[in-house]
């Protein structure tokens, strides 16, 4: 598993597993809505009234419509690493 994928895969898998409705914003501003049906290294299969294959390089943001649990040890470690890298020590 690539270093940059250690948070992405558990996040998408939890969305898929819990059937969480999502809004996916593309880099060109288009908003897509549906449920993550499947995904791989390059694409997300988004299901609504039809299934759409969305290339990850075209995605800006994935917004879940409700809270959900990403229960994965790797995801927790990846987030902790991200927080450590971006902590400037200024707790205002």
Swiss-Prot record:
- From which lineage does this chain's organism come? Bacteria, Pseudomonadati, Pseudomonadota, Gammaproteobacteria, Alteromonadales
What keywords were assigned to this record? RNA-binding, Stress response
A Pfam family: Hfq
Q: Which domain of life is it from?
A: Bacteria
Q: What is this protein called?
A: RNA-binding protein Hfq
| Gene designation | hfq
Q: Which HAMAP family match?
A: Hfq
Any single biological process term in GO: regulation of RNA stability
Q: What quaternary arrangement does the UniProt entry report?
A: Homohexamer.
Entry similarity comment: Belongs to the Hfq family.
Q: Which purpose does this protein serve, as stated in its record?
A: RNA chaperone that binds small regulatory RNA (sRNAs) and mRNAs to facilitate mRNA translational regulation in response to envelope stress, environmental stress and changes in metabolite concentrations. Also binds with high specificity to tRNAs.
Example GO CC term: the record gives: cytosol
Q: Which organism is it from?
A: Shewanella halifaxensis (strain HAW-EB4)
Q: Which residues form the Sm domain?
A: 9-68
- Entry keyword annotation includes Zinc: no
Enumerate the GO terms in the molecular function aspect.
RNA binding
